[in-house]
Amino acid sequence: MVPEPGPVNSSTPAWGPGPPPAPGGSGWVAAALCVVIVLTAAANSLLIVLICTQPALRNTSNFFLVSLFTSDLMVGLVVMPPAMLNALYGRWVLARGLCLLWTAFDVMCCSASILNLCLISLDRYLLILSPLRYKLRMTAPRALALILGAWSLAALASFLPLLLGWHELGKARTPAPGQCRLLASLPFVLVASGVTFFLPSGAICFTYCRILLAARKQAVQVASLTTGTAGQALETLQVPRTPRPGMESADSRRLATKHSRKALKASLTLGILLGMFFVTWLPFFVANIAQAVCDCISPGLFDVLTWLGYCNSTMNPIIYPLFMRDFKRALGRFLPCVHCPPEHRPALPPPPCGPLTAVPDQASACSRCCLCLCRQTQIQTPLQGAPRACSSQPSFCCLERPPGTPRHPPGPPLWSTSLSQTLWSLRYGRIHSVPP
């Protein structure tokens, strides 16, 4: 969102020879700006293709991300290249009629990017605070309607005022000859900045703060529920040997620490997202208002702050997928050279050996899956009858369940002798024995 066409009562800038190009350091500046442009276009294009080609990513929530990446891609392809030429040469070097059109696209694309960030925060807010009702509230037609509304508002805040000359009402300043800068009046700047930045920023702060509070509350509830369930399970177990003193409290502290770390990670994630948004865009809008009030911002400083705002379109496709596991996995499948490290879960002690095969309660997707719990013995598989050696760590082995075998046959738990085994059942589900 930059810059400023026209003298008083004219929607086109004043033209003349203009200042010469910057004599020193222009090569390094051009190289840096080219890197920003290429990175912005490549990253946003990659993520748009990734969402469109990976079935796991085609959901309602990612509609908003596609809209965000589309607006950021337009910033990289339509807005940044003319802005780079304008910064390097110190004047508008393209066709005279393109100045107003480029300025309108500049305002529209950057405003659409900010409004899409607001929609993403709203979507996350509904998903976290009411996950059971989310599918009913955020349907695909409603998501598309919100996206269309955001783009319509961005277009109305850019093309309509500039074409009708509303930005010139009450203005008494003219740009330098050969410049393409939007020297808008103070009323226009206040209204446009409020609609496209300050109101969406307030909504983003509100939703992310509510998400943070909800994440902390859920972490505390899950920690207390888990420790309470573990304690109740211990009271009902027939323990053949006396557990070590302090074992229960140590495991409870470990679980509480785990959920505290999750809440801290959520806090850091939201802090990074909010921090990057305000660091990149807030200086520009403050300078834009100051420029309309006192004309005390130099063109060079204004260009730097403008490019800082453009960099938000570069950071969005890097920051948002960075904290989303689905994007990491899809990117690893889409790009063979990218290897995502496996997820590390807290190691739990393996259960004792037994000659039986166990089936978890959660085996809804496969009635044929069994959980191999033996460490050193061999289990006769119910299908082939061939022995199968079990590793030291639990692993899933897909086997057809014999016809007539109930999904959860009655029988005592396979193991229930210590707190660690109870925690294992809390994590992976209740375990029932299945006769071979």
Swiss-Prot record:
**According to the UniProt record, which cysteines are disulfide-bonded?**
C99-C180
- Please give the InterPro entries that the UniProt record associates with this protein: 5HT6_rcpt, GPCR_Rhodpsn, GPCR_Rhodpsn_7TM
Picking any one GO biological process from the record gives: positive regulation of TOR signaling
> Record's PROSITE patterns?
G_PROTEIN_RECEP_F1_1, G_PROTEIN_RECEP_F1_2
**Keywords for this protein:** Cell membrane, Disulfide bond, G-protein coupled receptor, Glycoprotein, Membrane, Receptor, Transducer, Transmembrane, Transmembrane helix
Gene3D superfamilies noted in UniProt: Rhodopsin 7-helix transmembrane proteins (1.20.1070.10)
Q: Where in the cell is it found?
A: Cell membrane
Q: Which residues bind serotonin?
A: D106, N288
Q: Which Pfam families match?
A: 7tm_1
What residues are glycosylation sites in this protein? Answer: N9
Give the signal peptide, or none: none
The record describes its quaternary structure and partners as: Interacts with MTOR, RPTOR and NF1. Interacts with CDK5.
Listed PANTHER family: 5-HYDROXYTRYPTAMINE RECEPTOR, 5-HYDROXYTRYPTAMINE RECEPTOR 6
Give the function comment from the record: G-protein coupled receptor for 5-hydroxytryptamine (serotonin), a biogenic hormone that functions as a neurotransmitter, a hormone and a mitogen. Also has a high affinity for tricyclic psychotropic drugs. Ligand binding causes a conformation change that triggers signaling via guanine nucleotide-binding proteins (G proteins) and modulates the activity of downstream effectors. HTR6 is coupled to G(s) G alpha proteins and mediates activation of adenylate cyclase activity. Controls pyramidal neurons migration during corticogenesis, through the regulation of CDK5 activity.
The record comments on the domains as follows:
Specificity for G(s) G alpha proteins is determined by the length of transmembrane regions 5 and 6 (TM5 and TM6).
Family, as annotated: Belongs to the G-protein coupled receptor 1 family.
What name has this protein been given in UniProt? 5-hydroxytryptamine receptor 6
Highest classification ranks of the organism: Eukaryota, Metazoa, Chordata, Craniata, Vertebrata
| Gene, per the UniProt record | Htr6
